[in-house]
């Protein structure tokens, strides 16, 4: 499945750490109402069956809004819930192996941090790239921020959609203008917001200026 650039505009990545008074389902629905263009379920806490149940529920929700649904890292869950996409990091299964498992219909996203990693991901069948960290982030304390100019260099080197991730929020989002990214992937800026729907509307308006 070809990854459309517009899927990357406002890409929500879930994080159970931000689930407070609402359920994750309610949070994701608020984000969808606010205009997110892609949802990635990143789940490190649940056992396989609970993860699968959640994946089916959130995938059905995303279908109502005609928004593609990605699973982070777990290829088996992605296959079983018929997700539109699977996203893997540099430490996870290689994109070429993922492609063998999922076939041609599922989109594959790969996290990259350099031009070399980006070109290798494309060569191995990636449909889109997550590039970061764009800025310092509270979500992953040990993350390395990209060197100056690296985001633009990666975007210039590939011909598939690129989404920036890492430490992005309303105040710094437009600093990515001119880098060539197709959109932004956000965790705490969305799911840590008091009013997720309203926050997503503001973030999307900014992302559309990139």
Which residue ranges define each predicted feature?
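A short acidic, helix-capping loop that chelates divalent metal ions and anchors anionic groups
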Residues: 41, 78, 135-141
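Conserved N-terminal beta1-alpha1 strand-loop-helix module at the mouth
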Residues: 1-93, 100-128, 146, 153, ...
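Glycine-rich, flexible loop/turn motifs
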Residues: 108, 131, 139-142, 186
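Asp-centered catalytic/switch region of ABC-type ATPase nucleotide-binding domains
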Residues: 181
């Amino acid at each position: 499945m070809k990854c459309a650039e517009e899927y990357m505009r406002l890409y929500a990545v879930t994080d159970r750490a931000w689930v407070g008074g609402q359920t994750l389902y309610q949070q994701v629905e608020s984000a969808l109402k606010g205009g997110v263009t892609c949802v990635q379920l990143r789940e490190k806490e649940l056992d396989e069956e609970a993860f699968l149940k959640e994946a089916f529920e959130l995938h059905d929700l995303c279908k109502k809004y005609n928004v593609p649904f990605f699973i982070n890292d777990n290829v088996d869950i992605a296959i079983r819930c018929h997700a539109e996409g699977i996203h893997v990091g540099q430490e996870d299964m290689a994109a070429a192996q993922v492609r063998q498992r999922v076939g041609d219909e599922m989109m594959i996203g790969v996290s990259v941090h350099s031009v070399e990693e980006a070109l290798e991901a494309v060569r191995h069948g990636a449909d889109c790239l997550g590039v970061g960290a764009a800025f310092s982030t509270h979500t992953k304390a040990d993350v390395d921020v990209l060197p100056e100019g690296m985001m633009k260099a990666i975007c210039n080197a590939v011909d598939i959609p690129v989404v920036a991730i890492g430490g992005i929020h309303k105040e710094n989002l437009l600093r990515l203008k001119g880098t060539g990214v197709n959109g932004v992937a956000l965790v705490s800026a969305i799911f840590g917001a008091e009013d997720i729907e309203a926050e997503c509307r503001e973030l999307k308006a900014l992302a559309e200026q990139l």
